[in-house]
Regions:
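N-terminal module of bacterial RNA polymerase sigma factors
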Residues: 1-31, 38, 124, 145-146, ...
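Internal acidic/polar
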Residues: 2-3, 84, 91-119, 143
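Conserved RNAP core-binding helix
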Residues: 9, 25, 33, 43-60
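Sigma70-family region 2
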Residues: 14-15, 38-41, 52-69, 88-90
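Residue-level preference for hydrophobic side chains embedded in well-ordered alpha helices
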Residues: 24, 28, 32, 53, ...
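Arg/Lys-rich amphipathic alpha helix in sigma70-family domain 2
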Residues: 62-66, 76-96, 164
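DNA-recognition helix of helix-turn-helix
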Residues: 79, 83, 139, 151-175
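A short pre-motif secondary-structure segment
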Residues: 133-137
Length: 181
């Protein structure tokens, strides 16, 4: 349920009030940016997805209807924008013949105790398929069946990619811990 202030801000944005729209961005921008960062490889890409998500949010705002949590609604919309961006990017790469480029590497600094920032970096470095499935399952709480439907893959593929993502993350964490010792 929305607080009265939240409802007033949303209603103001629905009326096209610039101040209300800015307040929505300021209030939900950081939370939605965190969602974008989990689905994107770079900060610049996450910022682009966030911008697209807010454009979509303001377009779809009349359909919100004040049913349920606005934060949850905005989060789901942002996840959908991030997935569509990923699928569009993957399609463009396949069409241009560069779909097998090596994944971004790098030598991140290792820490014995991983903080949120370090864990986010590890997740961002996962191959695209692993990263998307990991986020949808482990963070967003979707089932493998739902993930399969969203991404157009088999349920078994979703399970396999999640297992591989977890294994990769465990290996990266162990590697960082060995370096830190």
């Amino acid at each position: 349920m929305q607080s009265m202030q939240e409802r007033e801000i949303i209603e103001g944005a629905l009326r096209g009030e610039e101040r209300a729209s800015r307040l929505l961005f300021e209030r939900y921008g950081p939370m939605l940016m965190a969602v974008c960062q989990r689905y994107c490889r770079t900060q610049a890409e996450a910022e682009d997805v966030l911008q697209d998500a807010f454009i979509r949010l303001f377009e779809k705002l009349p359909k919100y209807g004040f049913q349920g949590s606005f934060a949850g609604w905005a989060r789901r919309l942002t996840v959908n924008v991030a997935l569509k961006t990923y699928q569009r990017k993957r399609y463009q790469m396949e069409q241009s013949g560069i779909d097998n480029l090596p994944e971004r590497g790098g030598s991140p600094t290792a820490y014995a105790d991983l903080g949120e920032k370090e864990l986010l970096e590890l997740v961002q470095n996962l191959p695209d398929g692993y990263r998307i499935v990991f986020n949808l399952y482990a963070i967003e709480g979707y089932s493998h069946k739902e993930i399969g439907e969203m991404l157009g893959i088999q349920e078994a593929s979703s399970r396999s990619q999640l297992l591989k993502a977890r294994k990769t993350l465990q290996q990266q964490i162990q590697h960082r811990q060995r370096i830190a010792i």
